[in-house]
Amino acid sequence: MIDESRVAGGALSPDGVAADVALAEVRRLRAGDRPTHGGRLFAYVYDPAVPGLDELAAAAHRESAHVNGLDPTAFPSLLAMENALVGAAGRVLGGGPGTTAPDVVGSVTSGGTESLILAVKAARDAHPEITAPRIVVPSSAHAAFAKAAHYLRVALDVVPVSVDTLRPDPAALAAAIRPETVLVACSAPSYAHGVVDPVAEIAAVAADAGVRCHVDACFGGWTLPYLRRLGEPVPAFDFTVPGVTSISVDLHKYAYAPKGVSVLLHRDAALRAPQYFAYADWPGYTMINPVIASTRSGGPIAAAYATLRHLGDAGYLRLAAVTRDAVAGLADAVRAVDGLRLLAEPESTVVCFTATEGGPDLFVLVDELTARGWHTQPQLSYAGLPASVHLTVTASVAPRVAEFGPDLAAAVEAAHAAGPVRLPAELAALVGALTPEALTPDLVVGLAAGLGLGDGGSDAGDGGGDGPGAGPLPERMALVNTLLDAAPPALRERLLVEFVGLLQRPTWGSDD
């Protein structure tokens, strides 16, 4: 829900407010968010349910919040902690002294998207002679690869995945490689379905073509090695695989650090070098940036360092075991309900399911689960793959697994009783005829009003939250998701850009 009346006075008060008042305002705003603890949110946050860990991370963050990563010589504490985080990630992912990848190096970034953008940049800039570079990715690859291609003006060649295995065919990826290809990417695991791509085969075809191979392990790559140690059949995906040149892994996911920390690893320093940006042709300080940002708060880095130190290898092994058992329990709950089926057998920390023929409307089911306190992530249909429900499973879910099965069965029953969502005839006709180019601001406002998104486009007001789309979102999103599901991907993108643009309007505050 969006309730801008809570910030009706604006962020900049005339004379300042007391510290406890400002903090109380933040807490009131946070009360409208999804719950970040308690094991009922299956996306966005990663909660290990370890007592005291939040307090430790917050204290470490506070110690380094105002330290600037712009200059590692001025603040050597950050350099030391970054190097330690890179070393830990490298070890977990098959690199370091005594391995077949002894020269692994890396950088700490703000998140998986930045890591992927930099992996693409390093591959592109390693070949300045290629004037029209390209990258090859499976259709299941994270959308951040498309973002990187867009930002860096690199062509994106997308190879479909099998509707049965949800994985790409290495031969199809090989066929997509051209003389201009600078990078081939794969996932371990994929975000949408939680399956591990055939990394060894993909890395081999990339190596045969003389092309870099990046493994996107941002999502569950930290956990996979621990699952293997627990006896799970995790295929090789890391630096033990010949031909893998870089790997990304998010510490703010299953390393359970607070948000804002990912690691991009390269097999050696020569592969990493094109990632850097340096500039001295101006009268100010000589700029050298290993990552995209220049100024970087040390808070997230210190919090991640403290988290890894506190949990330790044994702690992560224990959390992986707890999560594995939770995944198994949730998968069993899905199997037990008529009308649902697993879209993929769980291989990592994801449960992904869809409806069978005659099953419930998935988007109505998501709303029914939300009404029962379970916050799941709907995924739209795509290229022969059905709409699905995604569950990111963390250790905090384990105590709740027994509650999920009965609630899932009740939600399915309620979704059947409600019946599928039917788009109003005028909306269905509009979506069928609409193209991204034909989407006007007036059409967007009309769609927003018809879908119950905000207030549908009243004129911007005085900051009391009455700008276009500034009102609360609908309690049930099935109609919105149904409309998006009916639209082709290009139209979905444009619609979402416009809808979010309606939500993001400044709060001006009062003139008092």
Across the structure, where does each feature detected by a protein language model lie?
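Active-site pre-lysine segment of PLP-dependent enzymes
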Residues: A172, V196-D208, G220-S246
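Active-site nucleophile and cofactor-binding loops and adjacent substrate-binding regions
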Residues: A74-L78, G106-T113, V137-S139, A344, ...
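Active-site phosphate-binding strand-loop segment of PLP-dependent enzymes
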Residues: P168-A217
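Short Gly/Ser/Thr- and Asp/Glu-enriched loop/turn motifs at secondary-structure junctions
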Residues: A101-D103, A344-V350, Y382-S388
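Active-site C-terminal subdomain of aminotransferase-like
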Residues: R229-T349, F353-T356
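Conserved beta-loop-alpha segment that forms the PLP phosphate-binding cup at the N-terminus of a helix
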Residues: L79-E82, V86, P102-I130, A144-A148
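PLP-dependent aminotransferase-like
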Residues: H127-P179
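Non-catalytic terminal extensions of PLP-dependent enzymes
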Residues: M1-L79, N83-G87, T354-D512
